[in-house]
Amino acid sequence: MDTVSATLSAAALLAIPEDKPERLFKGGPDEVKKAYRTLAMRWHPDRNPYPGARAVFQHIQRMLGKAEEKIASGDWPCRGVLRLAAVDGRTYDIGYLRRHRFELGAMAVANTVVAFEIDRAHADLVHRAERAIRGFRFADDRMRGQIGRHLPGFPFAGAFRTGTGNAYVIVMRKRPDLLLLRDVLDHFGGRLDPRHVAWVLSSLLNLCCYFHFAGITHNAFSPDTCFMSPSDHSVAVLGGWWYAAASGERMVAAPANTLAWAPHDLLCTRRAGIRTDLELVRAVGRELLGDISGARLARESAAAQAMIEWLRLPAFDDPIDEYRTWRTQVLHDSFGARRFAELPLTQSDICD
């Protein structure tokens, strides 16, 4: 197991939810068993004189049980091989690094691709995603080069219906340096350094400016749809395109997270608008700082006051204005002069 997990304190171990064993155990089934043996030897009450050792040991046992349940059901998020049989008889093997369930199906994150399995009941949303991604437009090649790398490419690396007919599979290309925000957030125990949150939000706000130009809305920004590159401080939005719509178009679906944080009038009009994406940028920022509601951020000094205030204020409907205020006022008041904050993190750090 990784050194960090092996040396976690009793309080840190007990703080890990029982239903999130992947925050403690990394790798495949063999690595999980090895990690458990290491932790069990350290925390067994017959070997450890710490008064709370029994509670820690029992907590570790319960997390092992949850890990074994997830492995047996195919829901274990760490390394494995996903075998998919297509309706044409061909078989595809995807060696994934992380795997996650989401509201429409499952997602497997590999080194150079990410595969989405969408339940058959949501076929119409798959077609909407394909139309949105195929329809990206750019003012010129310079814009295409600057913005295109933060969006899914088309044609997809793969797209097919499974042989059982129960799911559609979309395989998107992914740069090896891109890490799912959810995995990064879990790796750091549910809270990121505000300096890194800042550049994630800068990248998302920049994308909102492009969406405004292109007349589209994404409607599903979250740590489960966005990927970050620690090496070049950028974000790519590869997931969630099932909910994309043209500005002003009537939305046919939205995930629960969007309904929770979108402008109130969205529930009444159901019309897509850029303000929804701008509100979700703020929600992403709050979640990365440890509290998506924003209620505890100031009390816990999760970031500078200027940043916290901006994250808790309602968004306006002009992304260019929002981006300008963020860059010239909020970032300056929060961090002073611009400096590159290194984040030495790779996929192997998360998976091994």
Model-derived features: positions:
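Conserved N-terminal boundary motif of the eukaryotic protein kinase catalytic domain
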Residues: 78-99
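ATP-binding glycine-rich loop module of kinase domains
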Residues: 95-149
